[in-house]
């Protein structure tokens, strides 16, 4: 992996890979000055650099080395839930991603831009993508947010599950409000 390549090709560097909760946790580690490189999403990186949102009052002096791949926001449900649009999340059980992850950050932004309140309008769970898929299959949640590349195997596997009809909830109407508040970080495909 990347740690092995860095250790092999960067003189004097001994890199190790560390499992974290995602972009926010990675950026918090960068802020300690101990790791030199981390994988993060652009919106979480900008928040860290500006010292806003989860980094309020604690800006992190980060620099971007490379963009590896574009991430896509998935708002995933199944037809049995009755969720057809973002407003239908009201009163539902929704996973907004692992706590402290960039999925959670972006989910909160999409929810707000769609005119919903993450604390009052839904019952929230904080699950990773695999846990969210299992919870949706078991009908413990009604929908989940996930930010990742295409294809994401957990979402693909959900769609291939017998008896499950996958529903991707359109959230493109939230884009203008997100760009207005956070800048041109978000685009429609």
Q: Model regions: which residues?
A:
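A structural signal for short loop-to-beta-strand junctions that line the ligand-binding cleft
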Residues: 56-68
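Pocket-lining segment of extracytoplasmic ligand-binding domains
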Residues: 42, 53, 118-189
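Structural signal for conserved beta-strand scaffold positions within catalytic alpha/beta enzyme cores
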Residues: 19, 64-67, 96, 126, ...
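Pocket-flanking alpha-helical
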Residues: 16-57, 75, 83, 130-135, ...
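Loop/turn elements at helix/coil->beta-strand transitions in domains of secreted/extracellular proteins
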Residues: 11-13, 34-37, 60-61, 91-92, ...
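Bilobed "Venus flytrap"/periplasmic-binding protein-like clamshell domains
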Residues: 1-9, 13-16, 71-138
